[in-house]
Amino acid sequence: IGGLDSAFRCLFSGSTLVVAETRSPEAAGQAIASHQVNVLPASPTFLNLMLLSGTAQKHDLSTVEIIAYGAEAMPQKVLSRLAKAFPNAQLQQKFGTSETGTIRIKSIGNESLFFRIEDSDTQWKVVEEELWLKTPSRVLGYLNADDGGLEADGWYRTGDLVEIDDHDNLRIIGRASAVINVGGQKVHPSEVEAILNEIEGIEAVSIYGMAAPITGSTVACEIVVSGDEGSRTWKRTIRNHCRGKLAPWKIPSSVKIVDSISVNIRMKKTIR
């Protein structure tokens, strides 16, 4: 829905829509510099790839005034690095679903993951951490499929888990489908990811569940690192860092070093 929103906004405002030749940070950087792009909409994963690849240093991206991100949870570490790499750009979080369309929200600050819903036509509530929406634009149903999260009274269960603060501001935690069940204990991948991102040398993280004979699942991780230490060393480093910060069942039991994090065609982390 984010791509459609960007395209329609360009049509409505008479703006020029620039499409990079390939889905790569290098191609995006070249397109931004060549066409002096003002607005950069992208997923957090792709924005992190741009940071890791040094795209901002290779190309003049000073014309970027707004970076709009969404489609998946944004790691705090990536958001903070973006703010430093693009000091003159406004970082705007976006939210929407194919079933409801985009929802008008406002980020609390450039380096804050919290936002508030400012759409007067949208009702919202949080049920067991899951965000529910009711909008005039909600779809009626699916062709040749069950109604899934579409409720008869007009509500839509988004499948997005959120944290809500005392001021009714929301923060996306992750997808309900990505929660790892370790012997009956629920583990949010984003919580583990945030702790691992505190470790110097870890550039990107993917947390997922791996089958285990006794607990059913165990927490596993793939990491992109800047050093040349092996998986065994990093596993020890991760366990030492997580001890006291995470419950024992949330600490990754499997650590795999990879060159890049697996993403889907929409440049979002692959949910396993």
Give each language-model segment a name.
Residues I1-L49, I66, Q92:
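AMP-binding/adenylate-forming
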Residues E26-G29, A56-K58, E193-A194:
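Short hydrophobic/charged patches on amphipathic alpha-helices used for structural packing
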Residues V39-P41, S53-S112:
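Gly/Ser/Thr-rich phosphate-binding loop
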Residues L40, G96, T135, L161-K250:
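AMP-binding/adenylate-forming catalytic core of the ANL superfamily
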Residues T45, E72-A73, S137:
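Alpha-helix/helix-capping structural signal
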Residues Q92-E99, R116-D119, Y208-M210, K256:
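Beta-strand->loop->alpha-helix junctions that form or flank phosphate-binding loops
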Residues K125-D153, Q185-V187:
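Conserved ATP/PPi-binding loop(s) of AMP-dependent carboxylate-activating enzymes
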Residues G244-K268:
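AMP-binding/adenylate-forming catalytic domain of the ANL superfamily
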